[in-house]
Amino acid sequence: MSGKIDKILIVGGGTAGWMAASYLGKALQGTADITLLQAPDIPTLGVGEATIPNLQTAFFDFLGIPEDEWMRECNASYKVAIKFINWRTAGEGTSEARELDGGPDHFYHSFGLLKYHEQIPLSHYWFDRSYRGKTVEPFDYACYKEPVILDANRSPRRLDGSKVTNYAWHFDAHLVADFLRRFATEKLGVRHVEDRVEHVQRDANGNIESVRTATGRVFDADLFVDCSGFRGLLINKAMEEPFLDMSDHLLNDSAVATQVPHDDDANGVEPFTSAIAMKSGWTWKIPMLGRFGTGYVYSSRFATEDEAVREFCEMWHLDPETQPLNRIRFRVGRNRRAWVGNCVSIGTSSCFVEPLESTGIYFVYAALYQLVKHFPDKSLNPVLTARFNREIETMFDDTRDFIQAHFYFSPRTDTPFWRANKELRLADGMQEKIDMYRAGMAINAPASDDAQLYYGNFEEEFRNFWNNSNYYCVLAGLGLVPDAPSPRLAHMPQATESVDEVFGAVKDRQRNLLETLPSLHEFLRQQHGR
């Protein structure tokens, strides 16, 4: 059968479902009927959501929605980095950094790209200076302008709205899903049906023909998009596509989460996500106006649910008997194929890795971008589906390996969880990257150090998502450094001297921003009209 796709059925709501409805509705320009079928009693997961910088350019700009508009509707705040706390020192779970070598046990994974000097990234000069005893300053504070403004809870935008650094967002996933529901149904003509799928009918070729709901209604379509979450209602249950478990790389499989009130006037609003190391995993903290979302991601092999709840609540001084808690079990891995026949899985029905680097929302719109790029007709050309599947496989596996490196290279060995992470095997590609890093080479160095060009070109960023800046922030932050400085620097005496001016310029920029930027709380009150 040939001819264009006329009908699309999205099964599942939540953030993934409504992002899919909005993105496809915009991309297809009214040439296909889109229906979103959502069970009325399925809760939306997520207690606070953190993102990455290309969300605006790759998703909201594509929809034509200004940043300030959706931010106000979704109680959104800004995120300039991830702050990793206590990933190097042994002890109880606490949001306060312990002492490490005379300073705090924390490091920032900031957005942005490392600057280059004489075609060598600044990271390599920093390590050369550190190796020769010329500096004891941590990598993040030496090479990036952001850490000092993060310490002071400054805004990444001035009160006139101008942007001074790269940033992402924190928001309430429920509010984003609701905002996109209104946008998709009111502006793009997406049909919204609340009903539960009871049966999936496949045709003689193995494709999905229709779904029947609990009320007896039948919905047929040319293309089915599975946004049903961890259930994988269409892709796994109906299409019987196997889910590839990745617990041999990542141990965490559970979470307990909640929201906590916060006194912004007294304490300010933090412009970063916190990732706090715990006995059997780690805890996120996602600040928003008046509260923060938080959750303990842990391994059920090393902590029972009761033990995790107790450790989590003790850290935030919460009563586990009265505090509303969201208890989550999740599968870590990806489908063997994200797209099978006329069924495409998007979001957690396709793949999932713990949110240590805030990739959940990114996985959704990256998959939507690839779906539109490889959009089929009714013949379902296997070349398109195979290419799409390779892109999703690479995206996930690359992120899985980067996340694993956080645990594998943490020097913590004080609990069975941290020791067990050292016994896992790194993927061959990841081991190659580490070997390059230790030999003084850059990993996935972008073609340019211009962050605006990098974040403004989704295709370029997708191909080079975890680059040298990311690896250096995390590996150096964990205390893993190259075996010796880059051999090239021994032949560049003028560059190794003149780079002092570059590091000095970073310090000047830090001082200027610290003196001139408003607090994030002040900026958000102006933006949100509070």
Swiss-Prot record:
Chain positions recorded as FAD binding sites: G13, T15, A16, A39, D41, E49, A50, V197, T348, I361
Transmembrane regions listed in the UniProt entry: none
Oxidoreductase in keyword set: yes
Keywords of the record: FAD, Flavoprotein, Nucleotide-binding, Oxidoreductase
GO function term, MF aspect, one: monooxygenase activity
Highest rank taxon of the organism: Bacteria
Site (Important for activity): E357
EC number: 1.14.19.9
Active site: K79
Effect of K79M: Complete loss of halogenase activity
Residues engaged in binding chloride: T359, G360
Binding site for L-tryptophan: E357, Y454, Y455, E461, F465
Family: Belongs to the flavin-dependent halogenase family. Bacterial tryptophan halogenase subfamily.
Subunit record text: Homodimer.
Function of the protein: Involved in the biosynthesis of the indolocarbazole antitumor agent rebeccamycin. Catalyzes the chlorination of tryptophan (Trp) at C7 position to yield 7-chlorotryptophan. It is also able to use bromide ions to generate monobrominated Trp.
Official protein name in the record: Tryptophan 7-halogenase RebH
Biological classification of the source: Bacteria, Bacillati, Actinomycetota, Actinomycetes, Pseudonocardiales
Gene name of this polypeptide: rebH
